Amino acid sequence: MSYLSIFRTNENQKQKWDSIIYEISEFVSAFFWDEAPDKYGLEAREGQQDMAFAILDAVRGNYHFAVEAGVGIGKSFAYLVPLLLYNKKTGLPVIIATSTIALQEQLMDDIKRLSPMLNVTPDVLLAKGQTHYVCQLRANDYFASPEGQQFARLKQKIVEGCQDRRAFSPPIPANVWEKINIVRYSRRACLGCPFSS
């Protein structure tokens, strides 16, 4: 490989990348101005499309992007539409970090709603901190105690596989949760635990 061929290869990759982003931008434009209002009854919002294109520009330019927008502009769809299409077209992962679990769960619902509209089937993972999940060993110890024996229904739900605090209905009282949740997982601390994988 010659020295000059490195630059040609980089130029070819840049052209291919630009072509992918252009193709995604065409889909984004068609979605927000044609499909969303006509096929799905969603309101066309100029600020939403502007934000979607700004996100594509950030992806194309490989830079960080922060946006502040008022309530009702459609921020979730504005970043999910281009990023879901980007993931479909490139196969590359997309990470969206939020400040609250409630917003993460809203985004999960929005992705379920958008996926058939965009003809995408992304692999989506909702990541929360470990304290939001049951520690089987601590739960077993608690349910064996006199205090824990009064929570037979809760124990049964855990045995059936419910592990996420927000999935329990009715909600688990804080004083009970702090006795059954994962406090701090580490290989060393959990060494020998029959539930650790």
PLM features: residue spans?
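N-terminal pre-P-loop "Q-motif" helix
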Residues: 42-59
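Walker A/P-loop
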Residues: 61-81
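A substrate-engagement module of RecA-like helicase motors
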Residues: 2-39, 90-197
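Alpha-helix capping and helix-loop boundary segments enriched in small/acidic/polar residues
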Residues: 42-46, 67-74, 98, 102
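Walker A/P-loop NTP-binding motif
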Residues: 54-57, 76-90, 110-114
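Short, surface-exposed connector motifs at secondary-structure boundaries
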Residues: 61-65, 88-95
